Amino acid sequence: MKHLVLGSSGQIGAHLVKYLQDKGEQVTEYDIEYKQWQDLREAYNPTLESYIDTCDIVHFLAFDVGGAKYLEKNQNKHHFITNNMRIMVNTFELLKTYNKPFIFASSQMAEMSYSSYGMLKALGEKITRDLGGLVVKFWNVYGYETNPQKSHVITDFIKMAKYDGVIKMRTDGTESRQFLYADDACEALLILAKKYKKL
């Protein structure tokens, strides 16, 4: 199966590429972090069109996002909102044009109307359903991360413990959270890709 992974350097995407390759799947990576011309914010991109046209399934993981500290700082800023709107509009248009099976990575935050990130993901879910794609809602995916500006809570805790000897929480610590290891998320994505036509 030929997989196109949009957002292939991100928290889930980087793990997904390795996971799929380890399983013997064909993978095309696509991420602005690797090549500047792989910018989903740009409406005209013939290379992306070719990748979408020739793949079997698209994993739409690309989004301008990070952990809580990144969202607190950026999610209500013009650049954050417009970056993600452009990514969605351009990508969904190509998915519609080529009528390609795809999985859209959403978030439990799509239920949180006070969050710009959540509202953007909720819009993405609506468009995905309209185009016949699959929505997967993730919550607190963790695994190895390389970008400290966008890192998530587990990575942050490990770094604090290692370098500071103290873990400073952003909350009072009384709430409970669900966490999903990145490889487990990847396993679920591959199962969905393989069973896509039956769902």
What are these regions (language model features)?
Residues 28-50:
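Adenosine-cofactor binding site in Rossmann-like domains, unifying the SAM/SAH pocket
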Residues 16, 59, 189-193:
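Hydrophobic "lid"/C-terminal helical patch
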